[in-house]
Amino acid sequence: HFSKEGYKVIGTSRGNFNLGELIGDDGAFSAQLDLMSKESIKNLFADLKSEDLLPSVLVNNAGITKDQLFLRMKDEDWDDVIETNLNGLFRVTKAFIKPMVKNKFGRVINISSVAGLMGNSGQVNYSSSKSAMVGFSRSLAKELGSRNITSNVVAPGFIETDMTTFLNDDEKVEVSKNIPMKRFGTVQDVAKCIMFLASDEANYITGQTISVDGGLFMY
């Protein structure tokens, strides 16, 4: 969506990948990034700055799960999820927000989850990290609104991605019974919401959490 609207898209991953091939845009920029490493983030910032590619729109969508019932959850299960989902969010945003402040324009869009809003059995670590993202985004919105920087959250529900492939067809039907729209969402549903928040049409929307979940969680 961003590429089709004329944005220069920058994608990151721990491993090697070709973003241009994935989205059909030869001009897309691919980079390796380890959210656990301040040095890795620093190097990416330097690379993008040298290419005059520092982003005005930052989409934080990295996330991992290590599901386990709380009574059986190991310390490392908690630490790893918080480190990636929350501390990684802090590090990346801290690094890339300063140019936005200088330019007096920016969009920070953080991808949370319905689990962070309503909780989910077996996901105390994941739900906590995604819920904290909401508080992070609201506080950032209050601090940086005067600099024309918006900070919002998109909270997807059950979406047809690799993270839901563990469900078989019968399980998907059962889960869908609790969704008013009776189906899983698509990646495009989420992308369109992100695109809207990045657009000029959303220039007066900040500190908000938008659920893309077919009505699973209403508040």
Residue spans of the language-model regions?
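Canonical Rossmann dinucleotide-binding motif of NAD(H)/NADP(H)-dependent dehydrogenases/reductases
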Residues: 1-10
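Substrate-binding pocket helix/loop in short-chain dehydrogenase/reductase
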Residues: 69-70, 74-82, 164, 175
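Active-site loop-to-helix junction immediately N-terminal to the catalytic Tyr of the SDR YXXXK motif
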Residues: 73, 119-127, 139, 167
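Active-site helix of classical SDR
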Residues: 93, 129, 137
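Alpha-helical segment proximal to the catalytic Tyr-Lys
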Residues: 98, 142-146, 203
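Residue(s) in the substrate-gating loop at a strand-loop-helix junction
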Residues: 113
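Short C-terminal tail/terminal secondary-structure segment
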Residues: 118, 195, 206-219
